């Protein structure tokens, strides 16, 4: 972290009904903060996702993030746009939404707990019907520490699929 920029590395592992445990993608993202007021912040994200599923191309992802927070609670909402790239790319830009409601320092005054959810509505040019959309919701634990003037954060979570198109279980 700096006062306005951070980078993250995420690993997405899922368990769909008809497949074994699957390493879905590895995501490298950068965040640039637009503003940070006392209880409200916004940022832009850019990420490149290395997709390991055979039938899909890698992804370029853009996000706009809003965060409302105080000393005890927070709510983060992301508006996400993804476009597949590479030789296996297909389709137009997709629209996703994610929400994360968290309670700060709930466990041992050092681990945050939150309810987290992701919704994939489909391509911007044609949203899918609800049963064909991907919706996963669950919980997440996270914490952080500082080492040699650098902030490090970790998070782990579980998501449960709500539609047939969603992975049944995902660890994030």
Tell what function each PLM region has.
Residues 1-171:
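Transmembrane beta-barrel domains of Gram-negative outer membranes and organellar outer membranes
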């Amino acid at each position: 972290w700096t006062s306005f920029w951070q980078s993250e590395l995420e690993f997405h592992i899922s368990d769909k009904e008809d497949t074994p445990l699957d390493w879905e993608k590895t995501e490298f993202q950068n965040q640039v903060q637009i503003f940070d007021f006392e209880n409200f912040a916004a940022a832009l994200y850019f990420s490149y996702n290395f997709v390991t599923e055979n039938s899909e191309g890698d992804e370029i992802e853009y996000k706009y993030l809003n965060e409302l927070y105080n000393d005890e609670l927070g709510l983060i909402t992301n508006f996400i746009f993804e476009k597949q790239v590479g030789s296996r790319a297909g389709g137009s830009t997709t629209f996703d939404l994610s929400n994360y409601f968290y309670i700060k320092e709930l466990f041992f005054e050092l681990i945050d707990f939150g309810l987290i959810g992701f919704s994939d509505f489909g391509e911007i040019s044609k949203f899918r019907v609800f049963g064909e959309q991907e919706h996963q919701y669950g919980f997440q634990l996270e914490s952080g520490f500082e080492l040699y003037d650098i902030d490090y954060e970790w998070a782990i979570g579980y998501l449960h699929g709500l539609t047939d198109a969603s992975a049944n279980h995902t660890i994030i």
